[in-house]
Amino acid sequence: MQVISYFDSDRKPHWLEEIRRSDWRAGAFLSNLISKGSFVNSFGEKSKILLLTEGDELISFCTYTEKDNIQPTELTPWMGFVYTFPEHRGHRYIGKLFNEIERIAENDGFHAVYLSTNHVGLYEKYGCEFLTQMNDMDGKSSRIYIKRIY
């Protein structure tokens, strides 16, 4: 398995189609942002889309962004759009992407990464800790987690 950056890939059309295959509304939203060329404008210049691949197959994806749907906030950077295809769940593959996000964040001078979700018990097994509740841009309450980088 290999972690690649969508924007650094020479196979963007293929990986965009793979993201579109996800059965998740946020995956469709992400692919739409990519198609429109508005991902970076929405989430910040240093934002990345990370893909865990096995040959031509997309196993998992997630993002590393300066901003998230929790605004306004001083918290940065964020990991989001966390998804693993159903046939690959249960193997903790997303941890490989989280490790890459931690490496990038540390290289960018950060000591923590944040995550907005309503899942309970999923991200804790990757070392994320509940931080607080905040409202997203639609006014809906979201759990904010912090992943400290040591």
Label each region the model flagged.
Residues 1-37:
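Short amphipathic alpha-helix that is part of the acyltransferase structural core
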Residues 40-45:
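Short loop/turn motifs at secondary-structure junctions and domain boundaries
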Residues 47, 140-145:
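Short hydrophobic/aromatic beta-strand or adjacent loop that forms the aromatic wall/cage
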Residues 49-51, 114:
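Residue-level detector of beta-strand face positions
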Residues 51, 57-67, 78, 83:
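Conserved beta-strand in the GNAT
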Residues 53-55, 147-148:
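Active-site beta-strand termini and strand-to-loop segments that position acidic
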Residues 81-84, 90-103, 115:
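Conserved acetyl-CoA-binding loop-helix of GNAT-fold acetyltransferases
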Residues 107, 111, 117-141:
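Conserved active-site alpha-helix within GNAT-family acetyltransferase domains
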